[in-house]
Swiss-Prot record:
This is N-methyl-L-tryptophan oxidase. Gene3D superfamilies: D-Amino Acid Oxidase, subunit A, domain 2, FAD/NAD(P)-binding domain. Its EC number is 1.5.3.-. HAMAP family: MTOX (MF_00515). Keywords: FAD, Flavoprotein, Oxidoreductase. Its cofactor is FAD. Pfam families: DAO (PF01266). The modification S-8alpha-FAD cysteine is found at residue 308. It comes from Shigella dysenteriae serotype 1 (strain Sd197). One of its GO terms (cellular component) is cytosol. One of its GO terms (molecular function) is flavin adenine dinucleotide binding. SUPFAM superfamilies: FAD-linked reductases, C-terminal domain, FAD/NAD(P)-binding domain. The keyword Electron transport does not apply. InterPro entries: FAD-dep_OxRdtase, FAD/NAD-bd_sf, Me_Trp_Oxase_MTOX, MTOX.
Length: 372
């Protein structure tokens, strides 16, 4: 059998692509080295932020707004346990922060619902937060967080129900490009398709070693917190920049545990074996202490944590491009630790590619040619 589309890597983007392409009527094969959702990539840990006024650059705003529409649609499949939670996101940092300047610019350009607060305004609204006098907050009322593993599970189930073939726990060992399509090699045999999507995350270089993607081991952890920090008490998700430039992110507490992680830094690794579990690196449990001590002093001890992996591009912007010399293969990689919120729209872009549809978005900033 020859498929219309083979998806290599069925984590966040791959799961979405499988659903949207199958729903569009294509004959699709989803593959993954493990059984998604799983603990081997970048999507585990239950939650991911979604921010609209994007501090990483205005070029992302059209993508994230479309992503939000698709997340809202997906959430309707899980109304008892919604995939998207509109908690709001407060972005904290010094008044001269370049990141916050980008947030403000994105909000202005796209007329997004963002409220600016000074330090006193932040602490009056959320007494649990402490910031210096020179800090500001940009509060995104319409943003919040996503339940990442539930989203992937839902997409995979919906794709399967729509007739998508799924080959999991079976790594792709090679990709061959031929005149009439793409062939993948697996322990289960060879499979052919007219087109392929490669969204294999951290270990994409195992298949395509020429790609400029660097795996980085990252950690996040849950700390003891009471009901004051919960969504029910209107405590928001957050990003926070310390005076030294370190960037943190976190979520409202659930079950008396607040999740927080540090966005920058991490341990460069070169193989999956190097991504050791949480707490096997001495600094894992204390990485968030500088932020907690200064900004959230009421949070308690570290309860537990997890390690994940970023697939960083050299400039930490996405790579969305066809494989050089092979227009029938689309790469979506280098998501650099800020990609999950875009998984829905990236999956839709992949499905459009498989149907020979022109994308509605300007993807020029994400081309591989920028690294030449």
């Amino acid at each position: 059998m020859k498929y219309d589309l083979i998806i290599i890597g069925s984590g966040s983007v791959g799961a979405a692509a499988g659903y949207y392409a199958t729903r569009a009527g294509l004959n699709v094969l989803m593959t993954d080295a493990h059984m998604p959702p799983h603990q081997h990539g970048s999507h585990h840990g239950d939650t991911r932020l979604i921010r609209h006024a994007y501090g990483e650059g205005e070029k992302y705003v059209p993508l994230v707004l479309r992503a939000q529409t698709l997340w809202d649609d997906l959430s309707r499949h899980n109304e008892d346990d919604p995939i998207f939670v509109r908690s709001g996101v407060i972005n904290l940092g010094p008044a001269d922060s370049a990141f916050l300047a980008n947030v403000a610019h994105s909000a202005e350009q796209w007329q997004l619902n963002v409220e600016k607060l000074d330090a006193q305004g932040i602490m009056a609204r959320w007494p649990e937060i402490r910031v210096p006098d020179n800090y500001i907050g940009l509060f995104e009322t319409d943003s919040g967080f996503l339940r990442s593993e539930l989203a992937i599970k839902t997409w995979i189930q919906l794709a399967k129900e729509a007739g998508c073939a799924q080959l999991f726990n079976c790594p792709v060992t090679a990709i061959r490009h031929e005149d009439d399509g793409v062939t993948i090699e697996t322990a289960d045999g060879e499979y052919q398709a007219k087109k392929a999507i490669v969204c294999a995350g951290t270990w994409v270089k195992d298949l395509l070693p020429e790609l400029p993607v660097q795996p980085v081991r990252k950690v996040f952890a849950w700390y003891q917190a009471d009901g004051r920090y919960s969504v029910k008490n209107k405590f928001p998700a957050f990003t926070g920049e310390l005076p030294n430039g370190d960037q943190y992110y976190g979520f409202p507490a659930e079950n008396d545990a607040l999740k927080i992680g540090k966005h920058n830094g991490g341990l460069v690794i070169h193989s999956a074996d190097e991504r050791v579990p949480f707490a096997e690196v001495a600094s894992d449990g204390s990485e968030a202490f500088p932020f907690l001590r200064n900004v959230l002093p009421g949070i308690g001890c570290c309860l537990y944590g997890a390690a994940c992996t970023y697939d960083n591009s050299p400039d930490e912007d996405f790579i969305i491009d066809t494989l050089p010399g092979h227009d029938n293969t689309l790469l979506i990689t280098g998501l650099s630790g800020h990609g999950f919120k875009f998984a829905s729209v990236l999956g839709e872009i992949a499905a459009d590619f498989a149907q020979d549809k022109k994308s509605d978005f300007d993807l020029t900033p994400f081309r591989l040619s920028r690294f030449q």
